[in-house]
């Protein structure tokens, strides 16, 4: 683990609903990271199309955010996994992650595709996936905040 643990949020924020979820995740992560000044956590956000292997290797935990597009994760998040898979395969085994997915009708295929990629990388699910259908509710945004806060807090314990 790095001297100061790093939480990397990789996202494809293509809609107002995803932007709301991303903001809530980031707020929770930053507040969770700042909860104990003795154990700081750096929270880094990268769009899925620009995040790369160096970002992943320098991080200690991950949050993945994507729309559910045509029964799959976004092409941007798929591109991210394609770019990082082999360079990060051995070095990131058992790293904790969480994810949030927004869909208008269904998120099943998007979640399944994320699970396939993260299983291949041997990452460990640290929080239940957050799946949101339709406009995010207050409860959805609170769950997104909790996702960010929980992953950041987990890094203060390691």
Spans of features found by a protein language model:
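N-terminal beta1-alpha1 ligand-phosphate binding loop
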Residues: 2-33
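Hydrophobic residues within alpha-helices
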Residues: 21-29, 114, 147, 151
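Short helix-loop-beta junction
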Residues: 23-39, 119-124
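Generic structural signal for residues in well-ordered beta-strands
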Residues: 41-45
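Residues at alpha-helix caps and immediate loop-helix transition turns in enzyme cores, especially N-
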Residues: 21-22, 76, 110-113, 140-143
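Short histidine/acidic/glycine/proline-rich micro-motifs that form metal-
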Residues: 15-16, 101-106, 132-137
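Helix-loop-strand module that forms the ligand-binding subsite of alpha/beta enzymes
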Residues: 48-125
């Amino acid at each position: 683990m790095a001297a100061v643990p790093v939480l990397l949020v990789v996202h494809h924020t293509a809609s107002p609903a995803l932007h709301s979820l991303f903001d809530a995740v980031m707020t929770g992560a930053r507040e969770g990271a700042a909860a104990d000044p003795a154990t700081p956590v750096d929270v880094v956000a990268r769009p899925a199309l620009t995040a790369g292997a160096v970002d992943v290797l320098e991080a200690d935990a991950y949050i993945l955010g994507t729309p559910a597009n045509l029964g799959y994760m976004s092409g941007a998040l798929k591109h991210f996994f394609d770019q990082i898979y082999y360079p990060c395969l051995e070095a990131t085994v058992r790293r904790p992650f969480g994810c949030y997915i927004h869909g208008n009708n269904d998120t099943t295929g998007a979640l399944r595709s994320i699970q396939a990629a993260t299983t291949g990388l041997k990452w460990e699910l640290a929080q239940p996936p957050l799946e949101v259908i339709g406009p995010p509710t207050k409860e959805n945004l609170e769950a997104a905040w909790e996702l960010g806060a929980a992953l950041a807090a987990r890094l203060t314990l390691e």
